[in-house]
Amino acid sequence: MAKLFRNYNTLVEYEADTNKPVNTICFIKDAKVIYVDGIQYSYKQLDYLSPAISEAEALEYMGKIIKNAQEVGLIYVKPVPTIYWTGDSNTISINYNDYTAESDSIIIDGVEYYQLKLDKDLDNDFYLFTNNTFTNLIFKDVDTSKVTDMHEMFYNCSALNSLNLSGFNTSNVTDMHYMFTNCSAITSLDLSGFNTSNVTNMMFMFGGCVALTSLDLSGWDTSNVTNMTVMFHNCNALTSLDVSGFNTSNVTNMMAMFYNCKALTSLDLSGWDISKVTDMDSMFGRCNALKTIRMVGCSQTTIDKIKAQLSSNGITGCTIVTE
């Protein structure tokens, strides 16, 4: 919880009756109330306080801010706060130097917060939820239209079992590498609404999603992607995967792309062009259950490359379907 509130000069009065760790904070501007761990308190705007409480003085904030061993009843906020998540478990942090806010809301675990307005000029969103222990994230009216970098956004969210990103605007995103890596509890992802037309890097994007049984990537435009290294590495619960819509004409690296997808029995690579791929090492390594690969509309060169990889990876009994 260290650094939970920092670098603010605009203060509000906060009347707390506990001294426990704060896990969730919700500000509702018009109602002039604040919810801390589901408990409602009122607040009012205070004038600038000089000297302001420093970060060091607020370091041990646990529901109240303590200054010189005395409770001062103040927290650092601004009238319209923006909320984002730190790497601490179940911690919500507020930092006005990094993000801007709008007046709409975001719903996290059924709790309504102010909208996250994520600005491309302000460090983007990589690492945003990294290493958190949330089990469910539901976004409502989250503005991601300016974001260009989402790499490692949900990295190592090992408890996350539900994630709805249907409202995400990814039209300006160029980097999604490691975005969902090690989300080991999630079983289903529908990312069909993602606009990936500007993405160039998808390396290890779903690596370590060991519980994933359903993955919808239909409608993806991957025409600018160059790196698909270990993209589905260790997705060992997937039984089928349709990536026939992928435009792979600019991809140069597919090393270990499906490595250890040990439950995978069918794969649709129809329409793929891998003429620029220079590294396919271990592309199907340990995919020993693979029985069918659809390659409708693929050139003979592409088909031969895939067959060569299957052979070098020790995959036998897999049928290539071309019509």
Model-derived regions, located:
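Short, intrinsically disordered N-terminal pre-domain segments
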Residues: M1-D17
